[in-house]
């Protein structure tokens, strides 16, 4: 991490947060840089593992949806262009998304690297991402593919139930409420998200596989892909992820 750049970045940190930011940088200074991509279908556990890896290696988590919303809200030049596209009902171009990722990488919390989640979804996007990273003199270090059988995913997702006001979640098989269909704390009814039914899930998985397999093949040819057996218990998956990144 360049010292001059790091010092300049501190100008953007509010005084009240300055000490915690300096302590974070001290802790992170000995960590190796890592630029990672997490690939996996809905329910594969990426969201569970991302915070663990982020904290362990002092990385930032880059979700394309979050970055687009932040760029639009802060009215950056790229954010303005993205907003124009969205207001016209158009897809935000690959170049624009890569540009927003490029901007996000300049943030102090991304100086040791990042976890990219939700991008790239196509080989063209992967190529554009590689081109941008090459201009920065860097590259993707590792792509983790959270591989899991569709039948296991269906069991995981279709059994999920939520208590709307608190966000508490249950599972009919793995973490059932004391009384079926009722929140343990309030006694209020539980609901199931619209996306958590078998038909919607099968459609999403079919789209994921057809769209993402070429991306998996792309990174496999570059010898940076590791398959993670995501059907295991979360702690076992964490161990496998750490082993892959060591």
Curated annotation (Swiss-Prot):
ATP binds at residues 43-48, 160. The keyword Cytoplasm applies. Its EC number is 2.7.4.3. Residues 63-92 are annotated as: NMP. Residues 159-196 are annotated as: LID. One of its GO terms (molecular function) is adenylate kinase activity. It is an enzyme of class 2 (transferase). Monomer. Belongs to the adenylate kinase family. This is Adenylate kinase 4. It comes from Arabidopsis thaliana (Mouse-ear cress). The gene is ADK1.
């Amino acid at each position: 991490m360049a010292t001059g750049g790091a010092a300049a970045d501190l100008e953007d940190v509010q005084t009240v947060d300055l000490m915690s930011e300096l302590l974070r940088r001290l802790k992170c200074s000995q960590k190796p840089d890592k630029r990672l991509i997490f690939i996996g279908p809905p329910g594969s556990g990426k969201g569970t593992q991302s915070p663990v890896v982020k904290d362990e290696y002092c990385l930032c988590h880059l979700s394309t949806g979050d970055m687009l919303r932040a760029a639009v809200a802060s009215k950056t030049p790229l954010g303005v262009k993205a907003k124009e596209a969205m207001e016209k009902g158009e897809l935000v171009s690959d170049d624009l998304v890569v540009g927003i990722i490029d901007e996000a990488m300049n943030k102090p919390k991304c100086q040791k690297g990042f976890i990219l989640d939700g991008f790239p979804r196509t080989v063209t996007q992967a190529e554009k991402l590689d081109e941008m990273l090459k201009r920065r003199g860097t590259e993707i270090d590792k792509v983790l593919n959270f591989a899991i059988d569709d039948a296991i995913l269906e069991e995981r997702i279709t059994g999920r139930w939520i208590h709307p006001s608190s966000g508490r979640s249950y599972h009919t098989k793995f973490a059932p409420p004391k009384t079926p269909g009722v929140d343990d704390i309030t006694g209020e009814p539980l609901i199931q998200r619209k996306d958590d039914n078998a038909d919607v899930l099968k459609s999403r998985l079919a789209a994921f596989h057809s769209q993402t397999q070429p991306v998996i093949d792309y990174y496999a040819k570059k010898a940076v892909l590791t398959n993670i057996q995501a059907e295991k218990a979360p702690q076992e998956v964490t161990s496998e992820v750490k082993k892959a990144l060591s």
